[in-house]
Amino acid sequence: MHEAQIRVAIAGAGGRMGRQLIQAAMAMEGVQLGAALEREGSSLLGSDAGELAGVGKSGVIVQSSLEAVKDDFDVFIDFTRPEGTLTHLAFCRQHGKGMVIGTTGFDDAGKQAIREASQEIAIVFAANFSVGVNVMLKLLEKAAKVMGDYSDIEIIEAHHRHKVDAPSGTALAMGEAIAGALDKNLKDCAVYSREGYTGERVPGTIGFATVRAGDIVGEHTAMFADIGERVEITHKASSRMTFANGALRSALWLKTKKNGLFDMRDVLGLDVL
């Protein structure tokens, strides 16, 4: 990797998250914006990435070819869609580039491809790059160990109208954190929809509810409900910049890593809590 600064390439440069990542990369000390990518045929190709993100000229031109910019970055940051991310993953694996992956909605085969690639390159793969969300995941583990065996657990998440996967990756990570603390597999205890005559709630399950509306950046609540009381642990994001800063922080953290699969809790050192 480049010794002076970590050079990053950003996928989906013209999207909501891509623009935030460009802004964060241009503002963060120790980070250099090396490349910005968009899909082939995009009207944004040839634009200056900084101007596209509204922060002034950067000198980095939006391109569609990873091959053309392979010498301009050390870490590839991807918050796009699974099919595109897996294509980028194969390229980064071939060329020894680190990756920060914030894409959600992978199937089991996609997740396995990421695990296999991490044997050769360093990857931070997280459902959410917010510091607050990752602190929340740790709190959920602790709450589950105390209340999980006797309370009803429900996870409610809300996002903007354009989000294409449900439940959100963060909601699933919350469920996995809770299930893991209870020595369960989320696949065996998750309930993702309720409609019509459902009968009484099955003890030991983890329910999910999804809201898609307006421009909600992201809201997540885990409820531990018993008779007479309930505990709710909530995180609300008001700006995507919190995710962008977390992703750039992860890229900096990867500078000393040659290979391995990590998540945001590794970056933040939350295992000590």
From Swiss-Prot:
Regions that span the bilayer: none
GO cellular component, as recorded: cytosol
Pathway annotation from the record: Amino-acid biosynthesis; L-lysine biosynthesis via DAP pathway; (S)-tetrahydrodipicolinate from L-aspartate: step 4/4
Positions that bind NADP(+): 39
Binding site for NAD(+): 12-17, 38, 102-104, 126-129
An annotated Gene Ontology molecular function: oxidoreductase activity, acting on CH or CH2 groups, NAD or NADP as acceptor
Any one Gene Ontology BP term: lysine biosynthetic process via diaminopimelate
Active site: 159, 163
Oligomeric and partner information: Homotetramer.
Family of this protein: Belongs to the DapB family.
Entry protein name: 4-hydroxy-tetrahydrodipicolinate reductase
Species per Swiss-Prot/TrEMBL record: Salmonella gallinarum (strain 287/91 / NCTC 13346)
Lineage, highest ranks first: Bacteria, Pseudomonadati, Pseudomonadota, Gammaproteobacteria, Enterobacterales
Gene name of the record: dapB
